[in-house]
């Protein structure tokens, strides 16, 4: 049997939460004890920063906002970040990879996140952003602001994963509590960071180093991520199929992905044929021209359970679209013109249905209760 190899690289990975929603997500990751990464929370709201349990916090734009927040104005968020650009640069400096978590449509997240990403790009840091989009019922203005913020952010990040809050209405049960929804929301961003970071930071039977991750994610544009968890005899097949099929994904051809990153997380009982099963399932939907990187992370606490995380990069719309293209459009027109890629969800083991045939072509609708989704920042504030 293979022996786990020691960590052969010491890549510095930082997770930056920008604004209220991003900071809350980072706080959740700290509590969940994701290993091998440094956490930062950035906000214009001094009171919000004092409340969260994140070791390193950065207040921006104090001369502009006086510590009172950006007031849902992205321009204030942007100028606040630019005011403290040197402070942000010091926080990012020395990183090999940076994750940026933010909610789009408000002030600080929408305005400051692109500035953080621009600084990271100037420093030559591999940068991945995971952001949320508002509900449609929040209004056209907020949606268009979010779309503009996403396009601005896309100019500077290497890969961008977008989580649509509006999908909550379709997949969450009406009886779910706010606390459960908040917990589910935070798990979305945690899953994105954990699935990628652990490939680098955790030893495994087949290690993936930072250079492999960089190859798959560098300058790839829009991305999609999925996670599947299963146990039992067919856990490898089931987990990988769940990871690449989601009721949140609409009309997305994953065969167009230019890069695919796969993390298999299991205990010491992981078998060679299970590794092969996951690999064959992933290759069944990916293009022959795609760069596919598959690695393992060993977690002694996962006795009979196996988790597969798939990140497909270089799919969907082109990078660096012009913001002026959408300024005069309604939110409906914007959504029709730009097809964004959505973060996958992991269904509960008791509710999962397995797709058996031609995964890349199937369009089956699966009724599953998700383990996690995102909640917008304005709902978080109401719950406080």
Curated annotation (Swiss-Prot):
Its main location: cytoplasm. It is found in: Cytoplasm. GO terms for biological process: division septum assembly; FtsZ-dependent cytokinesis; protein polymerization. The keyword Lipid metabolism does not apply. The keyword Transport does not apply. Keywords: Cell cycle, Cell division, Cytoplasm, GTP-binding, Nucleotide-binding, Septation. SUPFAM superfamilies: Tubulin C-terminal domain-like (SSF55307), Tubulin nucleotide-binding domain-like (SSF52490). InterPro entries: Cell_div_FtsZ (IPR000158), Cell_div_FtsZ_CS (IPR020805), FtsZ/CetZ (IPR045061), FtsZ_C (IPR024757), Tub_FtsZ_C (IPR008280), Tubulin/FtsZ-like_C (IPR037103), Tubulin/FtsZ_2-layer-sand-dom (IPR018316), Tubulin/FtsZ_GTPase_sf (IPR036525). It holds the Pfam family FtsZ_C. GO terms for cellular component: cell division site; cytoplasm. GTP binds at residues 20-24, 107-109, 138, 142, 186. GO terms for molecular function: GTP binding; GTPase activity. Belongs to the FtsZ family. HAMAP family: FtsZ (MF_00909). Homodimer. Polymerizes to form a dynamic ring structure in a strictly GTP-dependent manner. Interacts directly with several other division proteins. Essential cell division protein that forms a contractile ring structure (Z ring) at the future cell division site. The regulation of the ring assembly controls the timing and the location of cell division. One of the functions of the FtsZ ring is to recruit other cell division proteins to the septum to produce a new cell wall between the dividing cells. Binds GTP and shows GTPase activity. NCBIfam families: ftsZ. This is Cell division protein FtsZ.
